[in-house]
UniProtKB/Swiss-Prot annotation:
Transmembrane segments: none annotated. GO terms for biological process: mRNA processing; RNA splicing. InterPro entries: G_patch_dom, R3H_dom_sf, R3H_G-patch, Splicing_assoc_domain. Residues 176-185, 474-492 have a biased composition (Acidic residues). Residues 720-767 form the G-patch domain. It comes from Saccharomyces cerevisiae (strain YJM789). Residues 42-52 have a biased composition (Polar residues). The modification Phosphoserine is found at residues 105, 217, 255, 334, 343, 345. Residues 1-60, 176-200, 466-493 are annotated as: Disordered. The gene is SQS1. PANTHER family: G PATCH DOMAIN CONTAINING PROTEIN 2 (PTHR14195). Residues 594-656 form the R3H domain. This is Protein SQS1.
Length: 767
């Protein structure tokens, strides 16, 4: 039979474990000290017998289902069922578990003893609605309706009366209205009663008026008409007007309209000739043009004479002639040459009336082919709408030019969400600038050009210095140079340059061919050959070099110095790394090979004072990890193991008890008096440190023997201090005699043993 757990037993049996009982803890009646406890006899049921019927006979027997044959239940039983027999007077536990309602007195609050938070909340609908503002509004509305109805009836009645009675009636009505207002202000309650009486006096027929005769239209001739002059208010301008508008490097004269709010650009008219915006530029270009060829001058003169009556810059299309553009050619010669005839400069014959600021075309005709400098696209930063972009927010450091679109390497927190540089496409940048920052689309190309120009500066061509062209000071050479053509000058200059370059070229080629073999000679390179190890390491030099002794010593000293320098540098580097790791919080770097028990305590003390929550120790052997966990327990910290095999280490964490409890230093001192040193098991120790911690082994000397050598040949004679020799001398032995009795003295010379390294000694032979 399976064992029954203790929580299935009664409360008394579960706690009764007497020492004198035969069945301890198994329902024994004895207590802890062996005394007997009287058990109360349990009745057949939990209901008490009573002669009082349940609910005075009005209710059924509650226990009839599980206790048939019983028809009476005492009041104590009912109280026990609903509220508990031994419950406190105001126990929330029993009141929540039982379905009863204690101290239910919602009507009488004084008689009820229950707290207000335990009483049920009841909502009762009011019989009357208390709204004083609503009543006042209703009264005022009724008063206004009666007053308006009386005025309408009186006005309609006065239409049919004589004109003489109208004045008296009006005075009477005004007096009556004033009296009514005084009465209303003095006695407001009386007006409420009069309103109901007035409403009852007015009949329904008096409320409506039927006009049987049509109303005659008034005579408009008798109405006087007055003409009122409108006074024009002076227009206040908050911005100071500047008659000169500067756009880039162009200045335009601007005029302000008197009545209209428009600003126009004044274009000067020089007589009947119409001003052209490029007239000055064209005249300067034509003024500076000249040709040295006389044939070209004659050809130009023929063209001018043949087309003198026609415009010089006439277009072949007939539509341009209809538009009214009439060009007149004019040409000025810069040189004082009378042979060249001047021609008139091209000018427009159509008048340009006005140029609007907003770019609208106000002049007549279809002059789309003409463009003014003011209509060209301005650079970024010359318009007010350009300042919606803060160049400090969008920092572009690089650009990748593409066939269709470009990519930008920029930093923008609003676009990217961080302060790092990222590559983004041009579409993403334009959408952000237009949608998010609000830059107009017409200014977008100017902004992109601004970014490109800031990253890729324009390279201006260098001015030619003509330093490679020889210039003579003599007047003869100057005259001859001016008389020759430009092509002859170039040929002469190139010949002079080539002659200077070729000077000494033959000698240079000869020298190069002479030393060509030595220049391209290859040398065999290999590492230095050495012998020995450590401090005994020396340079091995070939005897075929036939170097003298001084040179060999110099090479050996340099080689040894090189080795010492490398060792010092390596040692200094290791010392520097160790010094830096001593102040590190990482214990794997701080203790590269092992740690002392005092180091473990110091680490716990520093960890207790720091704000860190975790501390990881280096991997130790199982006993070392267990020691660290014991110390962590005495410091009121939580410890756990991480890793596997040789990489198992202990991690210490702080808990709530660590802050409010002090460490147990007595137990910590006991652990410190035990094992002192703990080495790491995840790395190998160097030989020097391994020899310091491990037991050194005795090293026996190695003896070398030679072929044919007699064993013990050089051994000294046994002296008189030897106790064995003294005993033999007492027995009658003398030096040089053999050992034995009389007649059998033995040999006087010992048998010699020779070393034979080329013999195998006695061995078993098959023969």
């Amino acid at each position: 039979m399976a064992k029954r757990h203790s929580h299935y037993q009664g409360s008394r049996r579960r706690h009764a474990r007497g020492s004198n009982s035969k069945k301890a803890g198994r329902g024994n009646a004895k207590g802890i000290q062996g005394r007997k406890i009287k058990k109360k006899p349990t009745p057949t049921n939990s209901w008490h017998n009573s002669s009082i019927p349940l609910g005075e006979g009005d209710l059924d027997d509650v226990g009839a289902d599980f206790n048939p044959g019983r028809a009476f239940i005492s009041p104590k039983t009912i109280e026990d069922y609903y509220f508990g027999r031994d419950a406190k007077s105001r126990s929330m536990k029993m009141g929540g578990l039982r379905p009863g309602n204690r101290y239910d007195s919602s009507t009488d609050l004084q008689a009820g003893r229950a707290a207000f938070r335990k009483r049920p909340m009841q909502f009762v609908k009011a019989k009357e609605v208390y709204d004083p503002s609503h009543n006042m509004i209703q009264k005022l509305r009724a008063k206004n309706e009666t007053k308006n109805s009386e005025e309408i009836v009186e006005r309609e009645a006065d239409v049919f009366e004589e004109p003489g009675k109208m004045t008296s009636d009006v005075e009477y009505i005004n007096n009556e209205d004033s009296e009514n207002e005084d009465d209303d202000s003095q006695n407001s309650p009386s007006t409420d009663h009069s309103l109901s009486s007035n409403e009852s006096k007015v009949e329904d027929g008096d409320l409506f008026f039927v006009d049987e005769e049509a109303q005659q239209s008034p005579d408009l001739t008798k109405i006087k008409r007055v003409c009122i002059e409108e006074i024009a208010r002076p227009r206040e301008v908050a911005i100071e007007f500047d008659p000169i508008l500067t756009i880039g490097k162009v200045e335009l004269s601007v005029s302000e309209g008197n009545e209209s709010k428009e600003i126009s650009v004044d274009v000067p008219n020089k007589g009947n000739k119409t001003y052209h915006p490029f007239a000055g530029y064209i005249s300067n270009v034509l003024h500076g043009m000249h040709t040295s060829d006389s044939d070209n001058d004659e050809l130009d003169y023929e063209i001018e004479t043949e087309n003198n009556s026609e415009p010089l810059y006439e277009s072949s299309a007939s539509s341009e002639v209809d538009q009214g553009f009439n060009y007149v050619g004019q040409r000025h010669n810069s040189r004082a040459d009378n042979n060249l005839l001047p021609s008139p400069s091209p000018q427009l014959t159509e008048d340009i009336k006005c140029l609007s600021i907003n770019g609208t075309k106000t002049f007549e005709g279809n002059n789309d082919n003409l463009s003014s400098p003011a209509s060209e696209e301005l650079e970024f930063g010359f318009k007010e709408e350009d300042f919606v972009i803060n160049t400090n927010d969008i920092v572009v450091s690089n650009i990748r030019m593409g066939g269709v679109d470009n990519s930008y390497y920029l930093r923008c927190y609003r676009l990217l969400g961080d302060y790092d540089f990222h590559w983004i496409d041009q579409d993403l940048l334009t959408d952000f600038v237009v949608d998010e920052l609000g830059l107009p689309e017409d200014r977008l190309p100017a902004y992109l050009n601004f970014i490109k120009n800031s990253l890729i500066p324009k390279i201006e061509p260098a001015e030619p210095t003509y330093s490679d062209i020889p210039i003579s000071d003599s007047s003869d050479e100057g005259d001859s140079y001016e008389g020759d053509s430009y092509e002859d000058d170039e040929d002469m200059a190139s010949s002079v340059v080539h002659s200077d370059i070729e000077e000494g070229l033959d000698d240079l080629i000869a020298y190069t061919l002479k030393h060509d073999t030595e220049r391209f000679k290859t040398f065999e390179t290999k590492s230095l050959e050495t012998k020995g190890k450590g401090k005994k390491k020396k340079l091995l030099i070939d005897d075929a070099l036939a170097l003298d002794t001084e040179t060999l010593e110099t090479l050996q000293s340099k080689f040894s110095k090189r080795i010492e320098t490398k060792a010092k540098k390596r040692k200094a580097k290791e010392d520097f790394i160790d010094q830096e790791n001593r102040n590190s919080n990482d214990m794997l770097k701080k203790y590269p090979y092992g740690l002392h028990i005092q180091n473990i305590k110091d680490e716990f003390e520093s960890f207790l004072s720091r704000n860190n929550d975790r501390l990881t120790f280096p991997p130790l052997d199982p006993h070392g990890n267990k020691t660290v966990m014991k110390i962590a327990k005495h410091y009121n910290m939580k410890s756990s193991k991480i890793g596997k095999a040789n990489h198992t280490s202990v991690v210490v964490e702080k808990i709530k008890k660590t802050k409010w409890s002090s460490p147990n230093y007595s137990l910590i001192d006991q652990l410190m008096r035990q094992r002192p040193v703990f080495m790491r098991i995840d790395i190998r120790r160097p030989r020097e440190e391994q020899a310091a911690f491990e037991r050194t082994k005795t090293i026996r000397g190695k003896f070398h023997v030679k072929e044919g050598e007699i064993v013990g040949q050089n051994a000294p004679e046994i002296g008189n201090e030897n106790i064995g020799r003294r005993m033999l001398e007492k027995l009658g032995w003398k030096s040089g005699e053999g050992l034995g009795i009389q007649g059998n003295k033995g040999i006087s010379e010992p048998i010699f043993a020779k070393i034979k390294k080329n013999r195998s000694g006695l061995r078993h032979s098959e023969s």
